[in-house]
C-alpha cells in the first residue's frame, strides 16, 4: 500500500512506496532517489515489509557489547558492598548473595573459588543492564526483552541487547539507541570490565616503541 516502508535489496529499493501502477511500483528510497520495480517481481522475489513494525509501536534494538574476556573475574566483598548501594543493583545483590550462600552451605566444601559459587563482574553488569533498560521509559516492557551472553568469539564475549523502543520513528529510535549505549560504555569500567577492540595504529606504534626501548636498554647494559 502507499506510504509503506519496503526493502527489496535485489533492486536496491529501501524506502516508502510512492506510487502503485498497474505494471510497476515506484519506491522513494531514504536517499531520496527512486527505484521502479516491475509489479510481477513482487510475485517472483521476496521483500521485507516494515508495516508490522510501524503498527506494533515498537522498533527493535539488536546490538552487542563485546567484552574483553581477560577482564572477567569474581567480585571482591568490597565491590559487592559498593554495588549494593547502586539503586538499580541493591535488590539483585541481596537476592543473589542469599541464593549463593544457600547453595554454598549445601554443596561447597570450602570457600575456595573452585568449590563455591560467587558473584562475578560480568554477571553483575548484565543484571545492571537489565535493570537499567527496565527503568528506561523509552524501552517497551511488553515486547521481547533480552539481555544475554552469546558464544565467545575472537573479538571478545558478546553481551547482546535485544529490546524494542517505544518510538518507531527513525531519528528518535536512533537517539534512544545511542543514549542507551552511550551510558553502558561509560558505566562499564565501574564493573572492572573493558570493551574489546582490535589494536589500532597507535597501539602498535606504542608496542614498537616499547620494544625498541627495551632493546636499547639491553644493549647499553651489555
Q: Regions from the language model: what does each represent?
A:
Residues 84-222:
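Long, non-transmembrane cytosolic or organellar matrix-exposed soluble domains/tails
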Amino acid at each position: 500500500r502507499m506510504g509503506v516502508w519496503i526493502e527489496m535489496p535485489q533492486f536496491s529499493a529501501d524506502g516508502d512506496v510512492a506510487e502503485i501502477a498497474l505494471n510497476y511500483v515506484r519506491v522513494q528510497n531514504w536517499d531520496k532517489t527512486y527505484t521502479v520495480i516491475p509489479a510481477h517481481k513482487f510475485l517472483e522475489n521476496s521483500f521485507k515489509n516494515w508495516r508490522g513494525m510501524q503498527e506494533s509501536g515498537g522498533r527493535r534494538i539488536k546490538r552487542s557489547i563485546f567484552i574483553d574476556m581477560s577482564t572477567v573475574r569474581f567480585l571482591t566483598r568490597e565491590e559487592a558492598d559498593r554495588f549494593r548501594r547502586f539503586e538499580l543493583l541493591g535488590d539483585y545483590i541481596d537476592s543473589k548473595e542469599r541464593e549463593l550462600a544457600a547453595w554454598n552451605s549445601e554443596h561447597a566444601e570450602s570457600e575456595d573459588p573452585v568449590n563455591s559459587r560467587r558473584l562475578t563482574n560480568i554477571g553483575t553488569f548484565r543484571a545492571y543492564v537489565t535493570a537499567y533498560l527496565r527503568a528506561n521509559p523509552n524501552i517497551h516492557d511488553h515486547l521481547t526483552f533480552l539481555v544475554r551472553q552469546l558464544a565467545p568469539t575472537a573479538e571478545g564475549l558478546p553481551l547482546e541487547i535485544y529490546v524494542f523502543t517505544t518510538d518507531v520513528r527513525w531519528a528518535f529510535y536512533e537517539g534512544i539507541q545511542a543514549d542507551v549505549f552511550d551510558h553502558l560504555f561509560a558505566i562499564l569500567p565501574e564493573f572492572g570490565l573493558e570493551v574489546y577492540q582490535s589494536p589500532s595504529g597507535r597501539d602498535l606504534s606504542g608496542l614498537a616503541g616499547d620494544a625498541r626501548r627495551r632493546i636499547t636498554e639491553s644493549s647499553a647494559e651489555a
